[in-house]
Amino acid sequence: SNETITRKGDVQMKKWIVILFAMLPSLAMAAGANVPLDKANNDLSDKASLQNGAKLFMNYCFACHSTQYQRYERVANDLEIPVDLMKENLIFDPEAKIGDLMENAIPEESAAKWFGAPPPDLTLVARVRGTDWLYTYLRSFYADPSRPFGVNNIVFPSVGMPHVLEELQGIPQPVFETKMVDGEEHKVVVGTKTDGTGELHTEEYDRAVRDLVNFLEYSGDPVKLEG
């Protein structure tokens, strides 16, 4: 179904995989390795999920993160999105053509100034981190006034990006427990509690994140859809 596509090329994976691993150091070296990961349970055969994931990516992630080893046309064909619908709702750059690579327009210098480093390309992020990590990470932001963007993340402590899905989830509050660390008591964030300000209920938000992760897994290896 194309009902999930609303509102505002060919990938040479083997050639670029080493380069992209080098471009993702912040993700590959993220802390929080001992945090239990929730199962994403995404389904690459679910076209409606993939379409919604593409919509979420373009609306909430693409302003900063590209998937520059994909082409709009390949995505439209693979996800069964009509080309006119793709152009109207998912290609925001008026100069971009359907056959172009999915590169965003944010200048690298500006991105480095705003975030401390250029936001990484996400074509292969699901390969680098895994779908369970992504699914848990996107559901683990919490309010932290001490951080530059007002949020932190259980899976990725001291994360250097805002909670881009805040509109959907709201800003969860941290849940603390006191634990002994090296013989001293420390307050540790062990979970989050949603504040009810997001557009989606918890189950709806989890489903949206699953769709986004589904799209990112597809992005990392489009040939999986042929299996």
Predicted regions and their residues:
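Electrostatic cytochrome c docking/interface patches
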Residues: 31-55, 66-77, 220-226
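Bilobed periplasmic-binding protein/Venus flytrap-like ligand-binding cleft at the lobe interface
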Residues: 57, 137-144, 212-216
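Extracytoplasmic/secreted proteins, especially bacterial periplasmic and envelope-associated proteins
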Residues: 48, 52, 56, 129, ...
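Post-cleavage N-terminal segment of exported redox proteins
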Residues: 4, 10-44, 216-223
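Electron-transfer interface patches adjacent to heme c in soluble/periplasmic c-type cytochromes
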Residues: 80-154, 159-182, 186-205
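The canonical Cys-X-X-Cys-His
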Residues: 57-68, 212
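Processing junctions and N-termini across compartments
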Residues: 24, 55-58
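Juxtamembrane amphipathic/hinge helix adjacent to a transmembrane helix
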Residues: 202-226
